[in-house]
Structure formats: C-alpha cells, structure tokens
Amino acid sequence: MPTPNISTSAAKGFRRAVSELDSKQAEAIMSPRFIGRRQSLIEDARKEREAAAAATDAAESTETIVFEEKDGRAMLNLFFMLKGVKTSPLSRALKVFETFEAKIHHLETRLSRKPREGTAELEYFVRCEVHSSDLNTFISSIKRVAEDVRTTKEDKFHWFPRKICELDKCHHLVTKFDPDLDLDHPGYSDQVYRQRRKSIAEIAFHYKHGDPIPRVEYTAEETATWKEVYSTLKSLYPTHACKEYLEAFNLLEKFCGYNENNIPQLEEVSRFLKERTGFQLRPVRGLLSARDFLASLAFRVFQCTQYIRHASSPMHSPEPDCCHELLGHVPMLADKTFAQFSQDIGLASLGATDEEIEKLATLYWFTVEFGLCRQNGIVKAYGAGLLSSYGELIHSLSDEPEVRDFDPDAAAVQPCQDQPYQPVYFVSESFSDAKNKLRNYAAHIKRPFSVKYEPYTHSIELLDSPQTICHSLESVRDELHTLINALNVIS
C-alpha cells in the first residue's frame, strides 16, 4: 500500500500526540503499516446504490411497476380510488380486469389516505396477474375509470432474510480487497499466504447455520503476528478504551483464551457472547456486501473472518481479519446496550432502499467502527476500527481531529476519509443516548412496514397490518404482566 500524503501541519499535530512515546514507537506509528482499514462497507453500499440507480434509469417504465414476472405474466400490486356515485364504478373497474384476463390474487378495501372534504372514501388494493405484453394498456385502462392509481413502485422493497437460517443466503462478497486481486494488499505477491487464506476461507464457504464453527490450527507465524498486534494494542487499552470494552476484555482473557500467545477460536467466543447478549458469530469468507452484513446484525449475528493479516504488515489490513474482529468488535458486542444498538442498525436496514443502506453503512462506520463516547467527562474509544488500530486509536484521542456530538442525520452523510486517518469523529454521551437517537432516525426510513425481532424463533416479524401489530402487543402485555407481578412480590 503506498504511503499516504500527510500535510506538514497534520504531521506536526500528530507528532505532538505521540510525543510521550519512545522514538521507536513514534516512528512506527507514522509508518503506513499503522494506517487503519479502508471504508469498504460504505464504498460498497454507494456502488450498490449507484448501480441500482443506473439500472433503473436504463429500464423501461413497465419494469418499475412489476412485482415479479414469470412465464410472460406480470404480478403487480395496484392501488386506486373509484370515480362516480350514481354509476357503478366497481363494476366498470372489474370489467377492465375481465377484458385483460387479469387474475386477481387479493382484493381489499381501505380508508383512503386522501379523503375528499367531508367524505370517508375507500381505496382499493388489488394484487393481480396480467399478461406482460398488456401491462401498459391495462394500467391506462384502469386510470380511465379510477383515480389516484398507484403501483408497487412505491411499495417495492429488497428481499431480506426472515429466518436466521436464511443468513445462509447472505453471502455476497466484495472481492476488491482480496489478496488475489488487490495489488496493494500486503499478501498479493505471497503465494503461500494467498493459498493459506483461501483454505481458511473454505470453512466459511461450507458453513451452514446451526453447525459448530470449525477450529483453525494457526501456524507459528500467524500466532507471532497476533502476538505483536495483541501486545501493542493492549498497552493502550487502559487509557484509551471505554469501560465497557475493558470489562469485556478482562472476561475474554479469563474465559475465552484471549492472550498474546493464542488466537481465540470463534466457536468458544460465540458461546461466550450468546450467554452475555444473545449475539453469536458466524464465519465469513471475506468482506460482505453492506446489505448482507447489516441484515445479519438484525438477528444478532456478527459475520466474522478467521484468517489473519499478512506477517509483513501486522498493524494494517486492507480487509477485515480476525485481529480486527476479535480485538475490535467482540468485546463491545458483549455489552447489552451496545449489542442492542448494533441490532437496531441491522433492523433498520431490512428492506431499505440502496440510498438508505449507504446512509446506514456510514452511520455504522462513524459509530461501531470509529465511534467515541464521553465517560466521566473524558472521551474514550469504543469503535472497532479504533480499538484494532494502534495509530488511529492514538490519533482519535489527540487534539488533531475534529470531534462532534453524535447526530445520526449528520453522521449518515458525513464524508469519510480513511487515508491516513479520520479528520472527524462523533462522540456519544452514552450508548443509551446513541441507541435512542438511532431509533428516532430509523423511524423516518420509508418502508411499507415495520419489523420486530422474535427472539424465541430467531425470526423477523413484519408489522404491516393491524392484525400483526395486535398480535405483537399480546407478547408485550404478557411481559408487562410478569413485571407487575414481580413488583408486587418485592413491594
């Protein structure tokens, strides 16, 4: 990876931040190997959105209204209001369906969203199937006998997993940082490393939900790389990491084999997390697409790599590796409030547009990856990208970068600069405060439904009708009943 350009003033400011370190450490931090990971999740989300927008612009108008198409017939959702009071508008509308041999799968009436003054009008929702070749003419004919005709274009949303086992389908990788393809990857010219990384990635390729995560027998060289990363970062944690991270890190050392001479196994760490917060790990071959990665968080599943960075660059990896995952992400996922915050980002992503996915990926970047928090008046780090990068961890708490109060609306559109380090970070007053702000932000994401995670069945419940909402309220009443009884017992 080429040495990044650092301005004279920035270099001086950064050297002030490391003035208390010995010369060897200071020299090491200024080297390119201490530069953090690239903004791959955000770049991926942006490219996904741009590609989808380009495809939409190039498509015919009929393609934007089709719910699905098969064997020459198109399925679509149709919304409309009917004209006239003296004639029979419904019979005229049905005549259009009959003329075009439309097969009606579902028909219902709703109170109109745009009632005329003094009247409560009905809106019709029809899910129907018509010949693809007749689609434009069919829509035009409906518009002649109905008002406010709308199609599925407004309500279309991306597929997302509804059951935890469907995460087996969320395997879309971003390969641009793969050592086989990235010329700047430290392992690009090392055939032995590339083959080793590929063999470890095969574990994730064959993994299915419910399987125990296979062990990896790490080599002496891999363990030596881990040791350098572990010991170097651990020296900073007492003064730079938030208290939630420190508490979890101590427990991981006690129960999960975290130490400088041992790379923890994902299965053991996953069991630990599940007992603490319900999160579990799942092996992944590499960098997932933003949509698939965020969807996993909705189920309290964290997609985790098992391979380790190249030995020539122990303090830098252009892609996520087990050092980043185990030292950066895992300790924070052991905190209940932070775990809920992470899941909320995932839930907000389900069915979201490509534009919203890009914003959520940026929010993830400035919180889960590079977030700061204020504890007892002192700013501490909680982001995984900071806690797994010696150089950026020091930089983030120096006087060099700009630190702003966390505002999801601002963070979601903040440009990212990750070479060499971030110029802007967002600081939260607490994880609870960040969680509440995120939920307010997510409430404004436009979807034709809301979602709720069902922990007993590890599934996503769609709240898209009064019936499903009432059903969900029943479980809330049951929980309230239990809590009221508990209060009565102790009072």
From Swiss-Prot:
Location of the protein in the cell: Cytoplasm, Perinuclear region; Cell projection, Axon
One GO CC annotation: cytoplasm
EC number: 1.14.16.2
Residues reported in the UniProt entry to bind Fe cation: H324, H329, E369
A Gene Ontology molecular function term of the record: tyrosine 3-monooxygenase activity
Pathway: Catecholamine biosynthesis; dopamine biosynthesis; dopamine from L-tyrosine: step 1/2
Cofactor(s) needed by this chain: Fe(2+)
Catalytic activity line of the entry: (6R)-L-erythro-5,6,7,8-tetrahydrobiopterin + L-tyrosine + O2 = (4aS,6R)-4a-hydroxy-L-erythro-5,6,7,8-tetrahydrobiopterin + L-dopa
UniProt GO BP: courtship behavior; dopamine biosynthetic process from tyrosine; grooming behavior; response to growth hormone; social behavior; vocalization behavior
Modified residues annotated as Phosphoserine in this record: S19, S31, S40
Keywords: Catecholamine biosynthesis, Cell projection, Cytoplasm, Iron, Metal-binding, Monooxygenase, Neurotransmitter biosynthesis, Oxidoreductase, Phosphoprotein
Domain of life per record: Eukaryota
Pfam annotation, one family: Biopterin_H
Biological function: Plays an important role in the physiology of adrenergic neurons.
Enzyme class: oxidoreductase
The family this protein is said to belong to: Belongs to the biopterin-dependent aromatic amino acid hydroxylase family.
Protein name: Tyrosine 3-monooxygenase
Activity control, per UniProt: Phosphorylation leads to an increase in the catalytic activity.
